[in-house]
């Protein structure tokens, strides 16, 4: 190997020795409660397919029909020749779902955050962001060139202190996950929105793990907190979690959406989402309304699993964060212990990957369990029994 690649191998070896080397598990089946890996069936407790819509017969059928009608690809970016009727229909549906004037669809959630934040703020502007935000938000903030300040997790006092310097900047943007993907807790959206309005800032909330989950009908954080859309609020979300499809979106005012169509580089330099994915997302939104029992089943399963996990924690002294959602982590501490526990679970028929740095802070490794509406009581009990035996 040349020196360049020798250095890469050295770094890989260092990752391995620290317990930070990553490998891929290959799934040979659909993303259901039970999946096939390496020729054997295991229970899946790590998928974001919260409502089971990725496997819904109507979603699959609609996606196939759209592919047969329009083809596999859109063929270009939206601003060239890749703007299809399905893109506009999906944008109308998500705007209605989120209660906003308009919406814009991106090729992924990551690309949404990477494109939108630099489009809104730059060198003369201020960003204040929660410490535990998703990597895509962090990268979007860094890419923007704005003054980038981080406040301790959900620390409103420190956030207010940072916003006191708002008048030194042209624009200000508060950035937060609404549901934090590694801890499962919920951001204090009402208080954040009040601060945004007081200091004339935008509040951009990433609803990736809230859309389809929070609120009586799954519309997200605003419904959960009984809030109305505000000109200071930017709702970002994805179709790839509870909605079982793929892609990202921004929902907001018409002016905001038109501005992003003209300034967000990841919008006009990316091939647009394919017809089959668009049709699946449209159908998934329809099913969220048509089959409310899915959301009810999800929260019933979450309660069942959490109650069982608390007993595991009490017996085995496992520290459990205060999760408020279907994301339920067990903190395990160090890399090697986490890897061994994940491997032991897999041997016993439970697939839950080890979450390690840089996804979480050093010493904060965890097993991140996620519960789906389609898990059966028997499957949940089996998982809890195995946990009691190995923890």
Model-derived features with residue positions:
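Structural motif of enzymes handling amino- and sulfur-group chemistry
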Residues: 272-291, 297, 301
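Conserved PLP-anchoring active-site segment centered on the Schiff-base-forming lysine
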Residues: 116-135
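N-terminal "arm"/small-domain region of PLP-dependent enzymes with the aminotransferase-like
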Residues: 10, 16-72, 201
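Active-site PLP attachment segment
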Residues: 217, 223-259
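Conserved PLP-binding catalytic core of the aspartate aminotransferase-like
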Residues: 296-303, 310-312, 316-348, 359, ...
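Conserved N-terminal alpha-helix of the aminotransferase class I/II PLP-enzyme fold
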Residues: 61, 65-108
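PLP-dependent enzyme catalytic core of the Aspartate aminotransferase-like
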Residues: 57, 61-65, 69, 347-350, ...
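Active-site phosphate-binding strand-loop segment of PLP-dependent enzymes
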Residues: 149-205
């Amino acid at each position: 190997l040349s020196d360049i690649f020798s250095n890469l191998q050295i770094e890989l070896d260092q990752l391995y020795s620290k317990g930070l080397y990553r490998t891929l598990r290959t799934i040979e089946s659909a993303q259901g409660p039970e999946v096939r890996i390496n020729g054997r069936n295991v229970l899946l407790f790590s998928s974001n397919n919260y409502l089971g819509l990725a496997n819904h017969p109507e979603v699959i059928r609609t996606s196939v029909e759209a592919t047969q009608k329009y083809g596999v690809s859109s063929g270009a970016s939206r601003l060239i020749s890749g703007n299809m009727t399905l893109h506009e229909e999906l944008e109308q549906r998500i705007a209605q779902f989120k209660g906003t004037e308009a919406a814009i669809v991106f090729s992924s959630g990551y690309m949404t955050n990477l494109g939108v934040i630099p489009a809104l703020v730059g060198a003369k502007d201020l960003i204040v962001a929660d410490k535990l935000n998703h990597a895509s938000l962090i990268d979007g903030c860094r890419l923007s060139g704005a003054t980038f300040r981080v406040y301790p997790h959900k620390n409103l006092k420190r956030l207010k202190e940072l916003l006191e310097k708002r008048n030194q900047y042209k624009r200000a943007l508060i950035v937060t996950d609404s549901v934090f993907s590694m801890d499962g807790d919920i951001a204090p959206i009402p208080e954040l929105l009040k601060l945004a309005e007081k200091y004339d800032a935008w509040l951009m909330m990433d609803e990736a793990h809230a859309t389809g989950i929070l609120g009586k009908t799954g519309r997200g954080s605003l419904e959960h907190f009984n809030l109305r859309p505000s000109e200071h609020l930017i709702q970002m979300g994805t179709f790839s979690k509870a909605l079982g499809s793929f892609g990202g979106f921004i929902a907001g005012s018409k002016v905001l959406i038109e501005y992003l169509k003209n300034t967000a580089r990841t919008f006009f330099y990316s091939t647009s989402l394919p017809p089959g994915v668009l049709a699946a997302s449209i159908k998934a939104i329809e099913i969220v309304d048509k089959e409310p029992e899915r959301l009810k089943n999800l929260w019933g399963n979450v309660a069942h699993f959490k109650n069982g996990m608390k007993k595991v924690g009490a017996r085995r002294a496992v520290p459990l964060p205060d999760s408020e959602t279907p994301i339920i982590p067990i903190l395990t501490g160090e890399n090697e212990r986490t890897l061994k526990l994940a491997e032991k679970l897999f041997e016993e028929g439970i697939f839950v990957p080890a979450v390690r740095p840089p996804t979480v802070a050093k010493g904060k490794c965890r097993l991140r369990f996620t519960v789906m509406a389609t898990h059966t009581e028997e499957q949940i009990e089996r998982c809890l029994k195995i946990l009691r035996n190995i923890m």
